[in-house]
Amino acid sequence: MTTIVSVRRNNKVVIAGDGQVSLGNTVMKGNARKVRRLYNNKVLAGFAGGTADAFTLFERFESKLQMHQGHLTKAAVELAKDWRSDRALRKLEALLAVADETASLIITGNGDVVQPENDLIAIGSGGAYAQAAATALLENTELDAREIAEKALNIAGDICVFTNHNHTIEELEIPAELPNLSQA
């Protein structure tokens, strides 16, 4: 599988992921890009799960973003509705972590949309390790979002055999006047 982590702190939100693609117990590729910018570079998205499935979801999610003028939550809910009702989509095995200036969300394979606590998302095979590491770093350091995501991925990569140290990191600056809706 893989590890994707998203951290929101101060005026930044980051989504980062490793590059390993595995088929069973074999590493097939080490430099896959599982984190992307969508909707005119205003939305970050990362996936864990089947690669082909994730690309299908990226395309569907981006079309929902276009349809809803970039409104992240509306697009995520509409994708989740499709995911639940479309027979082909229901068979897709992937998780999406998405974020923009205002919110961070997980879109699950069951068609659920979850807004996490503590401005932190960690999904995939190394997600629990990355979440534990990022939580400790958020609570006990002044590191910025990018540094926390990077360190959390490194720790997950040291522990999880399906996570490597070839990272893709995307970052958005959050304008100071925007409220942090995830703490509302």
Swiss-Prot record:
Substrates-to-products reaction catalysed: ATP-dependent cleavage of peptide bonds with broad specificity
So where does this one cross the membrane?
none
* Keyword Hydrolase attributed: yes
A GO BP term here is: proteolysis involved in protein catabolic process
Binding sites annotated in the UniProt record for Na(+): 157, 160, 163
Assembly notes: A double ring-shaped homohexamer of HslV is capped on each side by a ring-shaped HslU homohexamer. The assembly of the HslU/HslV complex is dependent on binding of ATP.
Q: What does this protein do?
A: Protease subunit of a proteasome-like degradation complex believed to be a general protein degrading machinery.
Name under which the protein is recorded: ATP-dependent protease subunit HslV
Q: What is the lineage of its organism?
A: Bacteria, Pseudomonadati, Pseudomonadota, Gammaproteobacteria, Vibrionales
Q: Which gene encodes it?
A: hslV
